[in-house]
């Protein structure tokens, strides 16, 4: 990745960074909850974003 990024690339990377976090614990405690973990977690080495 270049040090000088275009603004659109930087926006995409910022969104991906925000999405790449674990599930909040209070969501797991809700009634009738079936979500156990964030299935869309991304590791920077294993899975690339294709941008």
UniProtKB/Swiss-Prot annotation:
Organism (species): Saccharomyces cerevisiae (strain ATCC 204508 / S288c)
Quaternary structure and partners: Component of the large ribosomal subunit (LSU). Mature yeast ribosomes consist of a small (40S) and a large (60S) subunit. The 40S small subunit contains 1 molecule of ribosomal RNA (18S rRNA) and 33 different proteins (encoded by 57 genes). The large 60S subunit contains 3 rRNA molecules (25S, 5.8S and 5S rRNA) and 46 different proteins (encoded by 81 genes). eL39 interacts with YIH1.
Record localization: Cytoplasm
GO molecular-function terms, A-Z: structural constituent of ribosome
Function: Component of the ribosome, a large ribonucleoprotein complex responsible for the synthesis of proteins in the cell. The small ribosomal subunit (SSU) binds messenger RNAs (mRNAs) and translates the encoded message by selecting cognate aminoacyl-transfer RNA (tRNA) molecules. The large subunit (LSU) contains the ribosomal catalytic site termed the peptidyl transferase center (PTC), which catalyzes the formation of peptide bonds, thereby polymerizing the amino acids delivered by tRNAs into a polypeptide chain.
Alphabetized UniProt keyword annotations: Cytoplasm, Ribonucleoprotein, Ribosomal protein
Gene Ontology CC annotation, any one: cytosolic large ribosomal subunit
Compositional bias ranges of the Basic residues kind: 7-20
Full protein name: Large ribosomal subunit protein eL39
